[in-house]
Amino acid sequence: MAELATIARPYAEALFKACAAQPGADLGSTVAWVDELAAIAADPQVRQLADNPKIESGQLFDLIAGVVRAPLSDAARNFLRVLIDNGRLEALPEVAAQFRALVNRQSGSSDAVVHSAFPIDAAALAELGASLEKRFGRKLNLSVQLDESLIGGVRVAVGDEVLDTSVKARLEQMKAALVA
């Protein structure tokens, strides 16, 4: 089977072009519903159901549309129906990632994942975001993931760049220096 990135690219590009063609289209809300649908499609139980040949595409569509938090827009319903009818539901998480990349490219921003040993409050996250935007030279869309193994500090991943200021990383550097 073809790689998911190859399958997902035309769907992500078509969705992006369709959103860009609509006057006053809100790409942020589109990213939100695409991400939500991707999370549902990535669920192992949904995958198992989608792979079951006894389940019709209409049943699968109704199930997924019924699970989302808010009612789907017509565009979201049509997009989901196309993916299901073409047997491409497994590509939806990759479609979401590529769509986010297209939106970020247009806005000149990047997604950044902040790994922290402890929860970060809104004020500290805003301050961290401002300093990271200065460091990376672009607007960042921050998301936080807790990782207690870091002991303290943060590790930030922006695309393929990583900034690691965690206690764990410093301890590993000290260990390497002492062993060498």
UniProtKB/Swiss-Prot annotation:
Q: What is its main location?
A: membrane
The entry assigns this protein to a family as follows: Belongs to the ATPase delta chain family.
Gene expressing this chain: atpH
- State the protein's purpose: F(1)F(0) ATP synthase produces ATP from ADP in the presence of a proton or sodium gradient. F-type ATPases consist of two structural domains, F(1) containing the extramembraneous catalytic core and F(0) containing the membrane proton channel, linked together by a central stalk and a peripheral stalk. During catalysis, ATP synthesis in the catalytic domain of F(1) is coupled via a rotary mechanism of the central stalk subunits to proton translocation.
Q: Which HAMAP family match?
A: ATP_synth_delta_bact
Source species taxonomy: Bacteria, Pseudomonadati, Pseudomonadota, Betaproteobacteria, Burkholderiales
PANTHER family, from UniProt?
A: ATP SYNTHASE DELTA CHAIN (PTHR11910)
Organism from which the protein derives: Paracidovorax citrulli (strain AAC00-1) (Acidovorax citrulli)
Keywords associated with the record: ATP synthesis, Cell inner membrane, Cell membrane, CF(1), Hydrogen ion transport, Ion transport, Membrane, Transport
Entry coiled-coil feature ranges: none
Q: Which domain of life is it from?
A: Bacteria
Checking InterPro entries in the record gives:
ATP_synth_OSCP/delta_N_sf, ATPase_OSCP/dsu
**MF annotations from Gene Ontology:** proton-transporting ATP synthase activity, rotational mechanism
- By what name is this protein known? ATP synthase subunit delta
Its quaternary organisation is: F-type ATPases have 2 components, F(1) - the catalytic core - and F(0) - the membrane proton channel. F(1) has five subunits: alpha(3), beta(3), gamma(1), delta(1), epsilon(1). F(0) has three main subunits: a(1), b(2) and c(10-14). The alpha and beta chains form an alternating ring which encloses part of the gamma chain. F(1) is attached to F(0) by a central stalk formed by the gamma and epsilon chains, while a peripheral stalk is formed by the delta and b chains.
A GO CC annotation recorded here is:
plasma membrane
The membrane topology noted for this protein in its Swiss-Prot or TrEMBL record is: Peripheral membrane protein
Q: Where in the cell is it found?
A: Cell inner membrane
